[in-house]
C-alpha cells in the first residue's frame, strides 16, 4: 500500500504510479521480471516475530507527523520491530524515491525532478529530540537529479541535529554523490561522527547487483577520501552475503576496505524483498557469520558486526562504541 494525498492506495510491486509531488515512480524499484520469480525457503534463524510495542507505535507516529521517510519501512528491513521497539529508527532523507535502481533494493525508483522538502532538516532534528536519541543514523535515497546529489540538504540536516544538541552522535550513511569531492566535502565539513558508504557486494558481482552509476572502487575511493580529509571521522561500509559470492571474495573485499582505512564493517544476509528482485543464492549460517567477524577483527577493523539479521545501521550505536556484539 502507498499513501497518496492521504489516501491508502494499493500499488502492485513493479508498477508505475504518480507521487504526491507529480512525478512518476516504480513501486519497489524493479519492474516486473518473471525470470527472478524464485523464492527460497528461509531457515529458522531468519524468522522474525512482530512486536508492535508502545515504543514502536511512538516512533511510527513521530516519523509520520513530521513527514519523514525511514529506510526501515522503505527497504523492508527485517529488524524494524526490534529497533522501533527500542526507540530507534534510521531516517531516510530527500524523500522515498531513488534515482537509481539496484537489483537488491525495494526502495521505489523514479526522477523526483529536483523536488525537496525544505522543512526536512528541522523536522528531522525535532523528531530526533522527541525520540530521545543519543545516536541517530541518517541515510537517503540517491538524488542524481540534484546538482550536488543532495549533499547540501544532507549536511543541513546534520547541522540542524547538532545545533539541537552537539552531544548527539550522528552517523551519515550517504550516497556516493557521483564521487565528486566538493559534494563529499559538504558532509565532511559538518560535525558528523561516522560517515558510511555501502559497498554492498564483492567486486565481481557489483555490475549485476548495483545500479550502473554505482561502482565498487567508486565506493572505496569515497571512503578513502573521507579518511584522508578527516582522519578522526570513523568510516564504515557494509556487505550483503547470499548473492553468489564466495567466502574468499568476501575476505578480499574486507582487505580492499581496510586498504582505504575503513574502520567498521557490517555483514548480513541478503533477503529477496520481492519476486522481481535478485534471488537468494545461499543462506549463510550464524556460525559462518561469526567466522566472518573473527576474520574481520584479525584484519584490523575496529569493529565488525556480522550476523544473519545485521544491516548497515543495525545497533549502530553499539558498533560506534566499539563493543563486542553478541550477534
Curated annotation (Swiss-Prot):
Ligand binding ([4Fe-4S] cluster 1): 72, 77, 83, 313
Residues engaged in binding [4Fe-4S] cluster 2: 98, 102, 105
InterPro entries referenced in this protein's UniProt entry, alphabetically: Aldolase_TIM, Elp3/MiaA/NifB-like_rSAM, LIAS_N, Lipoyl_synth, rSAM
Source domain of life: Bacteria
Gene encoding the protein: lipA
A GO molecular function held by the record: 4 iron, 4 sulfur cluster binding
EC number in record: 2.8.1.8
PROSITE patterns the record matches: RADICAL_SAM (PS51918)
Family that this chain belongs to: Belongs to the radical SAM superfamily. Lipoyl synthase family.
Catalysed reaction, written as an equation: [[Fe-S] cluster scaffold protein carrying a second [4Fe-4S](2+) cluster] + N(6)-octanoyl-L-lysyl-[protein] + 2 oxidized [2Fe-2S]-[ferredoxin] + 2 S-adenosyl-L-methionine + 4 H(+) = [[Fe-S] cluster scaffold protein] + N(6)-[(R)-dihydrolipoyl]-L-lysyl-[protein] + 4 Fe(3+) + 2 hydrogen sulfide + 2 5'-deoxyadenosine + 2 L-methionine + 2 reduced [2Fe-2S]-[ferredoxin]
Subcellular location: Cytoplasm
Residues in Radical SAM core domain copies: 83-302
Cellular component, GO, one term: cytoplasm
Taxonomic source organism: Francisella tularensis subsp. tularensis (strain SCHU S4 / Schu 4)
Protein name according to UniProt: Lipoyl synthase
SMART domains, per database record: Elp3
Coiled-coil parts of chain: none
Claim: 4Fe-4S is one of the keywords in the record: yes
Swiss-Prot/TrEMBL keywords: 4Fe-4S, Cytoplasm, Iron, Iron-sulfur, Metal-binding, S-adenosyl-L-methionine, Transferase
Primary localisation category: cytoplasm
Pathway stated in the Swiss-Prot or TrEMBL entry: Protein modification; protein lipoylation via endogenous pathway; protein N(6)-(lipoyl)lysine from octanoyl-[acyl-carrier-protein]: step 2/2
Cofactors (names): [4Fe-4S] cluster
Cofactor detail note: Binds 2 [4Fe-4S] clusters per subunit. One cluster is coordinated with 3 cysteines and an exchangeable S-adenosyl-L-methionine.
Amino acid at each position: 500500500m502507498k499513501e497518496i494525498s492521504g489516501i491508502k492506495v494499493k500499488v502492485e510491486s513493479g508498477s508505475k504510479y504518480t507521487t504526491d509531488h507529480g512525478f512518476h515512480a516504480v513501486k519497489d524499484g524493479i519492474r516486473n521480471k518473471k525470470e527472478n520469480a524464485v523464492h527460497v525457503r528461509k531457515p529458522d534463524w531468519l524468522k522474525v516475530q512482530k512486536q508492535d510495542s508502545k515504543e514502536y507505535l511512538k516512533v511510527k507516529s513521530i516519523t509520520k507527523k513530521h513527514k519523514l521517510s525511514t529506510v526501515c519501512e522503505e527497504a523492508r528491513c527485517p529488524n524494524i520491530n526490534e529497533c522501533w521497539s527500542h526507540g530507534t529508527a534510521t531516517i531516510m532523507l530527500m524523500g522515498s524515491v531513488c534515482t537509481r535502481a539496484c537489483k537488491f533494493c525495494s526502495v521505489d525508483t523514479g526522477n523526483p525532478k529536483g523536488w525537496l522538502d525544505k522543512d526536512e532538516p528541522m523536522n528531522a532534528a525535532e523528531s530526533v529530540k522527541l525520540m530521545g536519541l543519543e545516536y541517530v543514523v541518517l541515510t537517503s535515497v540517491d538524488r542524481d537529479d540534484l546538482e550536488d546529489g543532495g549533499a547540501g540538504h544532507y549536511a543541513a540536516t546534520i547541522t540542524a541535529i547538532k545545533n539541537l544538541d552537539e552531544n548527539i552522535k550522528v552517523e551519515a550513511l550517504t550516497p556516493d554523490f557521483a564521487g565528486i569531492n566538493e559534494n563529499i566535502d559538504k558532509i565532511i565539513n559538518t560535525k558528523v561522527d561516522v560517515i558510511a558508504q555501502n559497498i554492498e557486494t564483492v567486486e565481481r558481482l557489483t555490475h549485476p547487483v548495483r545500479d550502473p552509476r554505482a561502482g565498487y572502487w567508486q565506493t572505496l575511493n569515497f571512503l578513502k577520501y573521507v579518511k584522508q580529509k578527516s582522519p578522526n571521522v570513523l568510516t564504515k561500509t557494509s556487505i550483503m552475503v547470499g548473492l553468489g559470492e564466495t567466502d574468499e571474495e568476501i575476505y578480499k573485499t574486507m582487505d580492499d576496505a581496510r586498504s582505504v582505512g575503513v574502520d567498521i564493517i557490517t555483514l548480513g544476509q541478503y533477503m529477496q524483498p520481492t519476486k522481481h528482485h535478485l534471488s537468494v543464492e545461499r543462506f549463510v549460517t550464524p556460525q559462518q557469520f561469526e567466522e566472518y567477524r573473527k576474520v574481520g577483527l584479525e584484519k584490523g577493523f575496529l569493529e565488525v558486526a556480522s550476523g544473519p539479521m545485521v544491516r548497515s545501521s543495525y545497533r549502530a550505536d553499539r558498533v560506534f562504541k566499539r563493543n563486542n556484539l553478541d550477534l
